[in-house]
């Protein structure tokens, strides 16, 4: 009889723990960070040496380093959406190809 009591207590603790995880997972969905999915307008773009280079950039780096991010379906689910938004914000801050401006040529110092 004691063994059945211990199994029952373990089952109750497991059910309560899973319920808390489910409740927390539901509540965090209402935190809005990471779901704006805004793509500001493209101001300028680098002069690519070939269409292949542009294609390679956008395939490998463009989602985080441009304003032309293709947001995957799972970017709407917290906490994954928070991580993706953080990575995109960080990537755009470091280098954003959609705001690329060439520097004016410097005059030679005399």
Predicted regions and their residues:
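N-terminal Lys/Arg-rich, disordered targeting/topogenic segments
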Residues: 1-8
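Metalloprotease/metallohydrolase-associated module, dominated by Zn2+-dependent proteases
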Residues: 11-14, 106-110
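Hydrophobic membrane-insertion alpha-helices, especially the h-region
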Residues: 12-32
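Conserved aromatic-histidine-acidic binding/catalytic patches
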Residues: 15, 49, 72
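Short, compositionally biased low-complexity segments
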Residues: 28-31, 58, 85-88
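Electrostatic cytochrome c docking/interface patches
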Residues: 36-57
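The canonical Cys-X-X-Cys-His
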Residues: 57-69
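Gly/Gly-Pro-rich "capping" loops immediately C-terminal to redox-active cysteine motifs
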Residues: 69-108
